[in-house]
Protein backbone atom coordinates (compact mmCIF):
# COMPACT_ATOMS: atom_id res chain seq x y z
CA UNK A 1 0.00 0.00 0.00
CA UNK A 2 1.47 3.34 -1.11
CA UNK A 3 0.08 6.85 -0.59
CA UNK A 4 0.55 9.76 -3.00
CA UNK A 5 -0.30 13.37 -2.23
CA UNK A 6 -2.43 14.82 -5.08
CA UNK A 7 -4.49 17.81 -6.11
CA UNK A 8 -4.47 21.33 -4.76
CA UNK A 9 -2.05 20.54 -1.93
CA UNK A 10 0.68 19.70 -4.45
CA UNK A 11 -0.03 22.91 -6.39
CA UNK A 12 0.01 24.99 -3.20
CA UNK A 13 3.30 23.47 -2.04
CA UNK A 14 4.91 24.19 -5.43
CA UNK A 15 3.76 27.80 -5.08
CA UNK A 16 5.13 28.04 -1.54
CA UNK A 17 1.66 28.16 0.02
CA UNK A 18 0.71 26.06 3.04
CA UNK A 19 -2.04 23.66 1.91
CA UNK A 20 -5.39 23.99 3.68
CA UNK A 21 -6.18 20.32 3.18
CA UNK A 22 -4.51 17.25 1.71
CA UNK A 23 -5.96 14.61 -0.59
CA UNK A 24 -4.28 11.28 -1.24
CA UNK A 25 -4.42 8.50 -3.84
CA UNK A 26 -3.81 4.97 -2.58
CA UNK A 27 -2.11 2.37 -4.78
CA UNK A 28 -1.94 -1.31 -3.92
CA UNK A 29 -4.95 -1.57 -1.61
CA UNK A 30 -8.52 -2.84 -1.69
CA UNK A 31 -11.60 -1.39 -0.02
CA UNK A 32 -11.47 -4.18 2.57
CA UNK A 33 -7.83 -3.41 3.39
CA UNK A 34 -8.62 0.27 3.85
CA UNK A 35 -11.50 -0.55 6.20
CA UNK A 36 -9.33 -3.03 8.12
CA UNK A 37 -6.81 -0.23 8.67
CA UNK A 38 -9.45 2.00 10.26
CA UNK A 39 -10.32 4.22 7.30
CA UNK A 40 -13.96 5.34 7.06
CA UNK A 41 -15.69 4.98 3.67
CA UNK A 42 -17.55 8.17 2.72
CA UNK A 43 -18.76 7.56 -0.85
CA UNK A 44 -21.31 4.95 -1.90
CA UNK A 45 -20.20 4.51 -5.53
CA UNK A 46 -16.48 5.19 -5.23
CA UNK A 47 -13.87 3.89 -2.79
CA UNK A 48 -13.14 7.19 -1.06
CA UNK A 49 -12.20 7.20 2.62
CA UNK A 50 -11.42 9.53 5.50
CA UNK A 51 -8.44 8.85 7.75
CA UNK A 52 -9.79 8.41 11.30
CA UNK A 53 -7.23 10.72 12.95
CA UNK A 54 -6.23 13.30 10.33
CA UNK A 55 -9.63 13.49 8.58
CA UNK A 56 -7.77 13.71 5.26
CA UNK A 57 -9.34 12.16 2.15
CA UNK A 58 -7.90 8.99 0.60
CA UNK A 59 -9.16 7.54 -2.70
CA UNK A 60 -8.16 4.25 -4.28
CA UNK A 61 -6.40 4.61 -7.62
CA UNK A 62 -8.74 4.08 -10.55
CA UNK A 63 -8.93 4.05 -14.32
CA UNK A 64 -11.78 5.54 -16.31
CA UNK A 65 -12.95 4.79 -19.85
CA UNK A 66 -15.49 6.91 -21.74
CA UNK A 67 -18.39 4.70 -22.88
CA UNK A 68 -21.18 7.18 -23.78
CA UNK A 69 -21.85 10.87 -24.23
CA UNK A 70 -22.42 13.06 -21.21
CA UNK A 71 -21.22 13.06 -17.64
CA UNK A 72 -22.45 9.57 -16.79
CA UNK A 73 -20.92 7.66 -19.70
CA UNK A 74 -17.89 6.20 -17.94
CA UNK A 75 -16.65 2.75 -17.03
CA UNK A 76 -14.63 2.99 -13.83
CA UNK A 77 -12.24 0.32 -12.63
CA UNK A 78 -10.85 0.09 -9.09
CA UNK A 79 -8.11 -2.43 -8.50
CA UNK A 80 -5.15 -2.74 -6.18
CA UNK A 81 -3.07 -3.29 -9.34
CA UNK A 82 -3.77 0.13 -10.89
CA UNK A 83 -0.73 2.38 -10.75
CA UNK A 84 -0.16 6.06 -11.26
Swiss-Prot record:
Binding site for CTP: 8, 11
SUPFAM superfamilies noted in UniProt: Nucleotidyltransferase
Enzyme class: transferase
Record-level Gene Ontology MF annotations: ATP binding; CCA tRNA nucleotidyltransferase activity; metal ion binding; RNA binding
The keyword Metal-binding is assigned to this record: yes
GO biological process: tRNA processing
Catalyzed reaction equations: a tRNA precursor + 2 CTP + ATP = a tRNA with a 3' CCA end + 3 diphosphate; a tRNA with a 3' CCA end + 2 CTP + ATP = a tRNA with a 3' CCACCA end + 3 diphosphate
Domain of life: Bacteria
Residues at which ATP binds: 8, 11
EC number: 2.7.7.72
Family: Belongs to the tRNA nucleotidyltransferase/poly(A) polymerase family.
Known role: Catalyzes the addition and repair of the essential 3'-terminal CCA sequence in tRNAs without using a nucleic acid template. Adds these three nucleotides in the order of C, C, and A to the tRNA nucleotide-73, using CTP and ATP as substrates and producing inorganic pyrophosphate. tRNA 3'-terminal CCA addition is required both for tRNA processing and repair. Also involved in tRNA surveillance by mediating tandem CCA addition to generate a CCACCA at the 3' terminus of unstable tRNAs. While stable tRNAs receive only 3'-terminal CCA, unstable tRNAs are marked with CCACCA and rapidly degraded.
Name under which the protein is recorded: CCA tRNA nucleotidyltransferase
Source organism of the structure: Francisella novicida
Amino acid sequence: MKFYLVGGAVRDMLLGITPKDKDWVVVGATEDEMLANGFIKIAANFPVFIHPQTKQEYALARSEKKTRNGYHGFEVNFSKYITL
